[in-house]
Amino acid sequence: MKAILLVLLYTFTAANADTLCIGYHANNSTDTVDTVLEKNVTVTHSVNLLEDRHNGKLCKLRGVAPLHLGKCNIAGWLLGNPECELLFTASSWSYIVETSNSDNGTCYPGDFINYEELREQLSSVSSFERFEIFPKASSWPNHETNRGVTAACPYAGANSFYRNLIWLVKKGNSYPKLSKSYVNNKEKEVLVLWGIHHPPTSTDQQSLYQNADAYVFVGSSKYNKKFKPEIATRPKVRGQAGRMNYYWTLVEPGDTITFEATGNLVVPRYAFAMKRGSGSGIIISDTPVHDCNTTCQTPKGAINTSLPFQNIHPVTIGECPKYVKSTKLRMATGLRNIPSIQSRGLFGAIAGFIEGGWTGMIDGWYGYHHQNEQGSGYAADRKSTQNAIDGITNKVNSVIEKMNTQFTAVGKEFNHLEKRIENLNKKVDDGFLDVWTYNAELLVLLENERTLDYHDSNVKNLYEKVRSQLKNNAKEIGNGCFEFYHKCDDTCMESVKNGTYDYPNYSEESKLNREEIDGVKLESTRIYQILAIYSTVASSLVLSVSLGAISFWMCSNGSLQCRICI
């Protein structure tokens, strides 16, 4: 009975002790992040770094509309294919759009030399001035300028030709040697295009140009080339057995370009003074154009985001996030929402001794829960919380700033003879994408591991801060909690939280209560020992008596022979 009273006294004393616990915030977030060691870790707060949404529209880029080529391509637009007449007045754009069925290009069959390089040059041009470099009415008085038309380039049901070129043929029975120069006074680069005609027979050569042994020379300070017509029988394309090759060059400001020929020259009529601009480009897309505005355009649609990565399309125009192949890039900013005692981090201390977060603490990441005679409640440790918020915010901003190198990534063009180069380029591009994706994912994994360990370390530090103040005035009872050996009112609790706890002031009371509790425990232990001895002796006596009774009964009924020797 005495032992029971002592145990109840000890239990009653412990139940009424004031307590202070250290813990951390928890909420109903379902955000998950990956770390180096774990996948799908639920956290209280996180930020997404990967944009995966677009509006499905082609928009203005920073307020400037794109140039949609419709059924025409770059070649048809610049040469002046009659089917592209609506594009001839275009002078400025944010980017150029071709579609998958942009078939109106070179109407007279032939090769467009260095066409892919020309597209690359245009990808950095935001506007140009189309001007008459050699006026048709006055530049070629000794040559015919109106007979150079073909059924391969029809317009309104009649034979026609490129609007930006003039196909010169003989006048009468004469094709005098021509020599014409243009001096670039535009203070901009000037794009000049021309053509060389290759007839199928010598008869066609004479009927068009009179001169059997004709030549063409085009020269500037950076371009010099002499051309000879290649007369040969070829299969008909678009009804033409002849071929026409197309050439271009850029004439620098102040430079001169000269055309000299005795036949077969398709001279430029219009040229283009180009203005370069960053952020332009050429995309191939069947997405419709809408009246909207964006800072980043992809062939699939516009992206309006400040995130550093996107997985929508590798081809982008404007200020765009970097393309990666990832499907998830989420960076932890808060704590583990369901902590595990077994969790072990890679970089810092672990607060694994605290099994669960507190949903009741909403004004901070780390803090306290106290209970005394005046009541109980939660209180955040604002200093450690604010330091953590500042540190993590700076880290996230730094990561975004470092990785958010926004840029235009236009596609590269290769002709049908450059398939090996195209395949090699694709492999190189894929390699870069793999590296960027790996770097981005590894960065997020490492930073998430650091962040979660950083939070655990902060909780551990807060616990150590309290333990170092209380010393033996309280005891650790597990799960981040302390039980005081003295009365600790709200003022006392606040002093522990703010680091001003007066240990000597409470040490005498704590010592007495600690000795009293230890004495109760010791007396209880002695009583238990006495009871244990008594129980053992009593059990032995009962066992001996039982064995004797059984033996007597067995001897009396003959089941057991009993002999008594003296």
Swiss-Prot record:
Glycans are attached at residues 27-28, 40, 104, 293, 304, 498, 505. One of its GO terms (cellular component) is virion membrane. The chain crosses the membrane at residues 530-550. A lipid is attached at residues 555, 562, 565 (S-palmitoyl cysteine). It is found in: Virion membrane; Host apical cell membrane. Residues 18-529 are extracellular. Residues 1-17 form the signal peptide. One of its GO terms (molecular function) is host cell surface receptor binding. One of its GO terms (biological process) is fusion of virus membrane with host plasma membrane. Residues 551-566 are cytoplasmic. Keywords: Clathrin- and caveolin-independent endocytosis of virus by host, Clathrin-mediated endocytosis of virus by host, Disulfide bond, Fusion of virus membrane with host endosomal membrane, Fusion of virus membrane with host membrane, Glycoprotein, Hemagglutinin, Host cell membrane, Host membrane, Host-virus interaction, Lipoprotein, Membrane, Palmitate, Signal, Transmembrane, Transmembrane helix, Viral attachment to host cell, Viral envelope protein, Viral penetration into host cytoplasm, Virion, Virus endocytosis by host, Virus entry into host cell. The record marks 344-345 as: Cleavage. It holds the Pfam family Hemagglutinin. The keyword Nuclease does not apply. It is a single-pass type I membrane protein. Palmitoylated. In natural infection, inactive HA is matured into HA1 and HA2 outside the cell by one or more trypsin-like, arginine-specific endoprotease secreted by the bronchial epithelial cells. One identified protease that may be involved in this process is secreted in lungs by club cells. Disulfide bonds join 21-481, 59-292, 72-84, 107-153, 296-320, 488-492. Gene3D superfamilies: 3.90.20.10, 3.90.209.20, Hemagglutinin Chain A, Domain 2. Homotrimer of disulfide-linked HA1-HA2. Interacts with human CACNA1C. Belongs to the influenza viruses hemagglutinin family. Major glycoprotein, comprises over 80% of the envelope proteins present in virus particle. This is Hemagglutinin.
